[in-house]
């Protein structure tokens, strides 16, 4: 079924391209050539649309893989893929900044992004160092940290500080749903007062992926969690389902169809006094504390956290 699917697709879109390794791109090229029965043309003659910012997070390469990659590629970035030596990429640069409106801050971010930041930029950022943030329901903030253990430690500590016993909500897996693909914990431990982040857009548009909130109450009988979002809106949150989907090509209808292999059902939230910079890429927060304890360990981390 995969062969027919790959043969029939016309356009391949890859988002967050900065995090895709060169060897993955070459593998995609080879697979598309073989299954499109078109060995001559790059990507089997398919259109390829790459979206992202190479100044954001870099590809993740484990130490044992790095040694092998270095033998074949000058960098792990997608643009070092060998296939790009055979084609002319058309580059389209987006100019307008939508996330920030302060021109001075946009300028500082540009300097950090291009590695041209100077003393004046650092001085401006340092005016925010050690700033006290008012903790109230109307003034939620989130800590971005580079290390997962820092994030876990902050969330566990904050949860333990809240009064009352924690409540554990068991997620339900049906069929095939790999643990590595779970969007939130299968055992979700929460308390009233806990700060959370939504990890899925709401069908009724009450929240989006990345909205911060505080748990106002938990009704176990009704299986409802009541959340006040950072803009003061009260929402009742029910369990949601995620699907593990495989795509296949239908010979009779000549259409691409979805095959659901399994599902995961859980509340679309996770603890969020802190999250990793990697998890924050693509999200927008109104109030942020950045914890660079231990420094950054990957290219683009500082820029992604600040932007």
Where do the language-model regions lie?
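Conserved ATP-binding/catalytic motifs of P-loop helicase motor domains
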Residues: 1-307
């Amino acid at each position: 079924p995969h062969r027919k699917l790959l043969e029939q697709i016309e356009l391949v879109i890859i988002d967050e391209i900065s995090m895709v390794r060169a060897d993955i791109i070459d593998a995609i090229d080879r697979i598309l050539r073989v299954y499109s029965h078109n060995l001559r043309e790059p990507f089997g003659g398919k259109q390829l649309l790459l979206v992202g910012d190479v100044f954001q997070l870099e590809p993740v390469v484990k130490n044992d893989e790095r040694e092998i990659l270095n033998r074949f590629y000058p960098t792990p970035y997608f643009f070092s893929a060998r296939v790009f030596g055979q084609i002319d990429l058309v580059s389209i640069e987006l100019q307008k900044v939508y996330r920030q409106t302060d021109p001075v801050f946009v300028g500082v971010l540009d300097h950090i992004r291009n590695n041209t930041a100077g003393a004046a930029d650092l001085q401006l950022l340092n005016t925010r160092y050690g700033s006290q943030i008012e903790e109230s329901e109307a003034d939620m903030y989130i800590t971005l940290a580079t290390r997962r253990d820092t994030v876990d430690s902050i969330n566990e500590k904050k949860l333990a500080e809240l009064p009352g016993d924690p409540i554990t909500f068991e997620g339900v897996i049906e069929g095939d749903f790999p643990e590595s693909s779970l969007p939130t914990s299968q055992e979700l431990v929460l308390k009233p007062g806990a700060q959370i982040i939504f990890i899925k857009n709401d069908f009724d548009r009450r929240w989006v992926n990345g909205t911060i909130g505080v748990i106002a109450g938990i009704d176990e009988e009704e299986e409802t969690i009541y959340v006040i979002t950072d803009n003061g809106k009260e929402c009742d949150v029910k369990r949601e389902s995620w699907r593990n989907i495989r795509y296949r090509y239908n010979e009779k209808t000549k259409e691409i169809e979805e095959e659901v292999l399994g599902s995961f059902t859980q509340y679309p939230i996770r603890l969020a006094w802190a999250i990793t910079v990697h998890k924050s890429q693509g999200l927008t927060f109104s109030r942020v504390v950045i914890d660079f304890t231990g420094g950054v360990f990957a290219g683009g981390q500082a820029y992604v956290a600040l932007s």
